[in-house]
Amino acid sequence: MGYPVDFEKGELNRGNWKRIKACMKKAEAGEPVKVGFLGGSITQGSLSSTPETCYAYLVYKWWKEKFPQAQIEYINAGIGGTTSQFGVSRVEQHLLQKKPDFILIEFAVNDDNNEFFRETYEGLIRKTYGDASAPAVLLMNNVRYDNGISAEDQHAA
């Protein structure tokens, strides 16, 4: 049943690498680094065979293996069935108050591909990127496994 991957539709915006480089230098120096995740069920790991096989934990594991000298803290604020509208309303309490150094956001499957979710997603990005702790922010877009659809077009607009 799979759906072909349309690499032509995929979008990559490298943006400014300053914050991620600073975060990695902090880890290289052996300083503590907090790695946070915000999203829906994919982030929560609801279809993973174990909590250790969800993408968020695997990214955390990469940080631990890449920077063994640093104390890496894992903060998974994924809640299944939620959208960026709920994400922007809870990001402060569930993630930002913990002062993460690195944040990965994923709502591409639960957000609809329309202007409303473009606005709520943009609000979420502005809130996380504009936080006083200046975290590195990485945005990820997955696709639905049943039909290959995501909100990537709106999120990238």
Question: Which residue ranges define each predicted feature?
Answer:
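A short helix->loop->beta-strand "cap" motif at the edges of active sites that frequently abuts
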Residues: 129-138
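N-terminal secretory targeting modules
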Residues: 1-37, 43-50, 60-70, 97, ...
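Substrate-gating cap/lid alpha-helix
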Residues: 143-157
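Residue-level recognition of beta-strand->loop/alpha-helix junctions
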Residues: 76-78, 108, 141
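Charged helix-capping and loop-helix junction motifs
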Residues: 117-124, 152-155
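Mobile, glycine- and charge-enriched loop segments
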Residues: 51-85
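Oxyanion-hole/transition-state-stabilizing segment in secreted/luminal serine hydrolases
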Residues: 24, 28, 36-38, 44, ...
